[in-house]
């Protein structure tokens, strides 16, 4: 599902991407709270729930096409997302931690960013803000280190500003909604995106 609030040309565009397969879970709750903070601060927001889309994994067959067009030629639900990524000023990626990395839904989405590898397209991401929101079940706070490292390196490669991250231990579905401190932190991250 893709949902948005329309805004004027001067507004910051914030794209929220939910990579959890679970509806109404901790990832979705936190990304929505970041987006609420961004909207209340005057940003236009758009929200994508990846599990509702049909996005195929990279097939490594269209490398030249990707490098010359800045998007992939696989005909699936990723196609309209390229323009949304290009048009955003900030991207909020939400994913639970699965095996020390992102969910399959988010990984496939990010793998299709190969289309941005050519400098002509990568430069369009220079200065865009990237935020990671990641709830995880493990009580070991080092659990998301590899996920953070992956996204930090990706942001560096594309000259994006890895501006914030929210890493939260949350064992049961929806638990974060009762954690006022975490919800405030998520809201504040969204509100700060305009700065």
Question: Which stretches of residues belong to each language-model region?
Answer:
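Short beta-strands and strand-loop turn motifs
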Residues: 17-18, 94, 132-135, 166-167
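Short beta-strand elements in bilobed, periplasmic/extracellular small-molecule ligand-binding domains
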Residues: 44-49, 160-168
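A short, flexible beta-alpha/helix-coil linker loop
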Residues: 136-139, 169-173
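N-terminal beta1-alpha1-beta2 submodule of the flavodoxin-like/Rossmannoid cofactor-binding fold
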Residues: 1-116, 173-176, 180-195
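Short, well-ordered helical secondary-structure segments
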Residues: 59, 112, 120, 145, ...
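Short, glycine-/small-residue-rich phosphate/pyrophosphate-handling segment
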Residues: 104-105, 119-164
């Amino acid at each position: 599902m893709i949902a948005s609030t329309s805004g004027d040309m001067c507004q910051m565009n914030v794209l929220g991407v939910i990579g959890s397969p679970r509806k109404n879970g901790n990832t979705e709750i936190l990304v929505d709270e970041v987006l609420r903070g961004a909207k209340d601060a005057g940003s236009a927001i758009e929200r994508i729930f990846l599990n509702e889309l049909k996005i195929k994994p990279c097939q490594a067959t269209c490398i030249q096409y990707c490098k010359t067009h800045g998007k992939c030629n696989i005909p699936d639900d990723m196609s309209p997302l390229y323009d949304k990524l290009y048009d955003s000023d900030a991207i909020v990626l939400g994913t639970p931690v699965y095996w020390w990395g992102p969910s399959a839904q988010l990984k496939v989405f990010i793998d299709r960013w190969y289309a941005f590898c050519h400098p002509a397209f990568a430069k369009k991401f220079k200065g865009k803000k990237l935020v990671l929101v990641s709830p995880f079940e493990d009580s070991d706070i080092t659990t998301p280190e590899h996920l953070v490292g992956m996204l930090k390196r990706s942001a560096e490669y594309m000259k994006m500003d890895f501006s914030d991250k929210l890493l939260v231990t949350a064992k049961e579905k929806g638990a974060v909604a009762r954690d006022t401190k975490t919800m405030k932190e998520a809201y504040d991250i969204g509100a700060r995106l305009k700065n």
